[in-house]
């Protein structure tokens, strides 16, 4: 479902802390799932589910334009947050650790793109794990390494932490986006995104002068 709710004031530090907590002692788990300059004035957290059709729509139809206009130009830093909706999309649960493990080999975003591209194939499968290994082949990742990693408690904990942090931020559906104190829900179009990002960027840039 696509909708835009009024922006809600929520402390971004709470979301960041909740998501990063389990692996903070070893590494920042968000690094592999981040696009854009770390010093960009605007940060967007995308709370998403790889089996969600509206998330696929956002990824393939909206995000490429946002990346070109805002991320590549240094205005926005974009962070992907795992939020599998188990009751609706059970195969999103194993898909998320697969993406985490691809990220540990520096290939989160290519894995992200493949998962959404072939959602119609692996989504209905009773056991999608073997298909994820074919995606690992496409990414030139070692099957054994990915398989062991996907079952590792730290990968599962990373996804769980993301999901819990998303719920604490106020997200209840996917895709949802936490944008500098506001929550946007649904696969809203580029025409909706532009005035939101432009106004926040202008305000943040003015404060920095």
Each predicted region: which residue ranges?
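Divalent metal-coordination and catalytic microenvironments
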Residues: 44, 111, 146
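Structural alpha/beta surface segment adjacent to cysteine/selenocysteine redox centers
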Residues: 40, 48-137, 169, 199, ...
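Bacterial N-terminal signal peptides
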Residues: 8-20
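Short gly/ser/thr-rich secondary-structure transition/capping motifs
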Residues: 26-30, 157-160
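A short beta-strand-turn-helix
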Residues: 27-42, 70
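N-terminal secretory signal peptides that target proteins for export/translocation
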Residues: 1-6
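Sec/Tat signal peptide C-region and signal peptidase I cleavage site
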Residues: 21-25
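C-terminal cap of thioredoxin/glutaredoxin-like
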Residues: 49, 60-63, 133-209
């Amino acid at each position: 479902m696509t909708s835009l709710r009024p922006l809600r004031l929520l402390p971004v530090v709470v979301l960041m802390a909740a998501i990063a907590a389990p692996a903070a002692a070893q590494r920042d788990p968000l690094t592999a799932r981040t696009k854009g300059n770390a010093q960009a004035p605007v940060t967007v957290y995308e709370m998403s589910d790889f089996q969600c059709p509206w998330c696929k729509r956002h990824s393939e139809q909206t995000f490429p334009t946002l990346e070109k206009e805002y991320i590549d130009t240094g205005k926005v830093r974009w962070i992907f947050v795992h939020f599998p909706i188990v009751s609706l999309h059970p195969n999103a649960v194993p898909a998320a650790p697969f993406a985490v493990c691809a990220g540990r080999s520096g290939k989160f975003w290519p894995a992200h793109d493949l998962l959404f591209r072939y959602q119609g194939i692996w989504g209905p499968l009773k056991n999608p794990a073997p298909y994820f290994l074919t995606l690992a082949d496409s990414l030139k990742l070692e099957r054994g390494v990915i398989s062991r990693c996907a079952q590792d408690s730290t990968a599962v904990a990373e996804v769980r932490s993301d999901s819990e942090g998303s719920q604490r931020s106020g997200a209840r559906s996917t895709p949802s986006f936490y944008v500098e104190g506001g929550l946007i829900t649904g696969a809203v179009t580029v025409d909706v995104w532009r005035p939101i990002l432009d106004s926040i960027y202008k305000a943040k840039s003015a404060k920095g002068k």
